């Protein structure tokens, strides 16, 4: 292939939209039917055939359950995912053993959720490179195990007896990709994490204005159980004890206390993808016996007229303590956090538990008030909505991406999990998930990784941008890319560099700049072509002369 043909081919490749025949192009986030794909059954058959062929490694027209299962698990979709359970069940024989299935059988099974399976196979879920994320999460988990500072909560007798060595980390993305490490199926009480759902339930039932006539939305700057109200005689926000008692009083006040509790527990179950939330009666009784401060807060709010008329204070406090005593495990809380990250829709069931505006309000207050009197520091260093509880639970929400639960009973002086805070620090150090990371990661290279991007996507885009700018003679863009950290001599799959393209197109200023950067003047592409041969073949004599001058040995060297 001659140099002009190579140059034309390369320009066509870098101009082609990603996903349309390019070897490394990034596919769109959601599969879309292309213009040339027939509509109706024929188009659907093409999608099913593409999926089937990706599993059929030995090309014998049959695939096994294990081929499908391993691919889905690698992408983060687990066998108990309700969206794919029907398909996985159909892949087993009558005796439960895996079976070989044909294309037609696969099509009958996959049609129950073909879009999800297709996105998983193509790497187009919320976190495309899920194995890399899970590897990092597992490493962070192992680094947390030796951390033993802090102490378990001792003002609630039952919590005092919890094993302080327990540790769990669980992750769930907005597409339902899941991973967990450690004691992720050990149940623990929600405690203050329950305040998030009580607030959301009150908002969905009464609306923002009505709820905030009874509770403020400013950080208190004080301890979570401080005997203090704002200047209007209202609790400062729904994330402190006084505020949570208030929002609890607003949840279905027309029902008796048993039905009100059932609604709260059922809501947690919906958020967690249908997994049943438990109740720790021992913790409830233990906390009820030591609830003098909460009673004092309740009487103080009643005296200031903060409650709606007719509130039964005794029943409200009982209801509040019951909500705190609901039990979940780390895997459930991660799914619940992912539901909040997904605008109130559970990723596993697609159940719209809360409205998007309700979740927006909740995440706003979690950002400013969710970590007790450490909330400001957490917002500054971590920059994500979170809610902690004295049981050692920490629910972290990355809006639009994932939810994370860290559970470790040892607490710091603020009442937050020591290991939970340390995990969050490690996470934001490794990934650009801080709310303001876009201000820094978009300007030059960074050690942080973007979990939303495909493996090698950044490097691919850098090569495309540099070679395209060089071919067009856009010297300012080439300079900007090099200044941001892009290696000027980087090559594409064919071994073509920016210098090849600039020489082939006669872009003398770009060639001169790349050479001044120390770029190799004679890189060889897969066809044996060099920048000099490209310039000569395309008749760019000025560029060819410059390259010969650079390649020609100095007179002293020639004499030797």
Feature annotation, model-predicted:
Residues 59, 68, 342-461, 465-468, ...:
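Structured C-terminal helix/loop/strand segments within mature extracytoplasmic catalytic/sensor domains
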Residues 120-142, 149, 202-323, 339:
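Active-site-adjacent helix/loop patches that line small-molecule binding or acyl-intermediate pockets
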Residues 43-60, 80-100:
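Primarily EF-hand calcium-binding motifs
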């Amino acid at each position: 292939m001659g140099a002009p043909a190579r140059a034309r081919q390369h320009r066509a490749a870098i101009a082609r939209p990603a996903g349309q025949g390019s070897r490394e192009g990034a596919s769109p986030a959601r599969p879309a039917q292309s213009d040339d794909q027939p509509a109706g059954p024929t188009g659907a058959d093409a999608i099913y055939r593409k999926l089937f062929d990706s599993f059929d490694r030995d090309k014998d027209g049959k695939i096994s359950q294990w081929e499908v299962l391993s691919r889905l698990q690698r992408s983060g979709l687990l066998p108990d995912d309700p969206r794919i359970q029907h398909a996985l069940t159909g892949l087993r024989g009558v005796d439960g053993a895996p079976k070989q299935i044909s294309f037609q059988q696969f099509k009958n099974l996959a049609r129950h959720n073909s879009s999800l399976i297709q996105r998983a196979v193509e790497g187009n879920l919320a976190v495309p490179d899920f194995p890399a994320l899970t590897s990092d999460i597992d490493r962070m988990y192992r680094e947390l195990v030796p951390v033993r500072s802090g102490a378990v909560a001792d003002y609630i007798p039952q919590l005092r007896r919890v094993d302080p060595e327990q540790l769990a980390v669980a992750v769930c993305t907005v597409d339902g990709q899941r991973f967990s490490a450690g004691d992720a199926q050990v149940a623990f009480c929600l405690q203050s994490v329950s305040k998030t759902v009580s607030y959301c339930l009150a908002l969905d039932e009464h609306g923002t204005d009505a709820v905030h006539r009874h509770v403020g939305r400013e950080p208190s700057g004080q301890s979570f159980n401080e005997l203090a109200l704002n200047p209007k005689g209202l609790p400062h926000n729904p994330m402190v004890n006084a505020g949570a008692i208030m929002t609890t009083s607003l949840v279905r006040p027309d029902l008796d206390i048993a039905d009100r509790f059932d609604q709260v527990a059922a809501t947690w179950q919906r958020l967690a993808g249908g997994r049943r939330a438990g109740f720790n009666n021992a913790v409830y009784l233990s906390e009820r016996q030591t609830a003098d401060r909460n009673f004092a807060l309740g009487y103080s709010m009643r005296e200031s007229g903060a409650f709606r008329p007719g509130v039964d204070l005794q029943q409200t406090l009982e209801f509040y303590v019951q909500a705190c005593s609901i039990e979940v495990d780390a895997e459930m809380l991660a799914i619940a956090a992912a539901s909040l990250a997904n605008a109130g829709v559970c990723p596993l069931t697609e159940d719209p538990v809360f409205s998007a505006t309700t979740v927006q309000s909740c995440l706003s207050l979690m950002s400013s008030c969710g970590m007790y009197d450490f909330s400001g520091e957490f917002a500054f260093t971590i920059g994500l909505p979170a809610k902690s509880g004295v049981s050692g639970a920490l629910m972290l929400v990355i809006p639009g991406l994932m939810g994370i639960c860290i559970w470790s009973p040892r607490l710091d002086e603020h009442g937050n999990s020591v290991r939970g805070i340390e995990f969050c620090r490690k996470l934001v150090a490794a990934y650009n998930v801080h709310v303001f990371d876009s201000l820094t990661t978009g300007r030059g290279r960074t050690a942080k990784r973007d979990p939303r991007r495909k493996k090698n996507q950044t490097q691919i885009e850098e090569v495309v941008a540099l070679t395209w700018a060089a071919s067009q003679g856009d010297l300012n863009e080439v300079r900007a890319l090099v200044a941001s950290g892009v290696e000027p001599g980087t090559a594409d799959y064919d071994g073509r560099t920016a210098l090849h393209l600039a020489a082939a197109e006669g872009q003398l200023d770009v060639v001169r700049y790349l050479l001044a950067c120390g770029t190799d003047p004679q890189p060889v592409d897969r066809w044996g072509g060099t920048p000099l041969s490209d310039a000569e073949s395309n008749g760019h004599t000025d560029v060819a002369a410059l390259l010969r001058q650079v390649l020609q040995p100095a007179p002293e060297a020639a004499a030797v």
